[in-house]
Amino acid sequence: MEHIIEINGLNKSFGDVKAVRDLSFHVQKGELFAFLGVNGAGKSTTISVMCGQLRKDSGSVVICGENIEHGLDKITRKLGVVFQNSVLDKSLSVRDNLRSRAALYGITGKEFKSRLSELAAMLDFETILD
């Protein structure tokens, strides 16, 4: 069966703190997968590496057949993550919050405007953008 996520020997440190140490796992297409652990176990760090928000120290990360070393742009366009706590800025409009998050994935300018317009119409939230 096809693996949609393959993590092999992943390591990530912050100075002397080893946040992720030699982590390996895979998720097969169609499989239900839960990523559980105590606070400080490296769950958020691992997900941040998978999304390209943090650089790994070593190991390999392959998502949908794309290695994050070479195919991060393709990966981030297919991958979505929702964290337990809100990452939205209450002082910004819906439009500006979406713009700042989209920029993290390289979606800016005309592409952002076009995609926002399409999604706002499809999901019926044009009236709350500003």
Predicted segment positions?
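Short coil-to-beta microelement around the adenine-binding A-loop and adjacent beta1/P-loop entry
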Residues: V17-K18, D73
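Short hydrophobic beta-strand immediately N-terminal to the Walker A/P-loop
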Residues: F33-F35, I47
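Walker A (P-loop) phosphate-binding loop of ABC-type ATPase nucleotide-binding domains
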Residues: V38-G42
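Conserved ABC transporter NBD signature motif
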Residues: C51, G59-H70, I75
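Conserved ABC ATPase "signature" region
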Residues: R99, A103, K110-I128
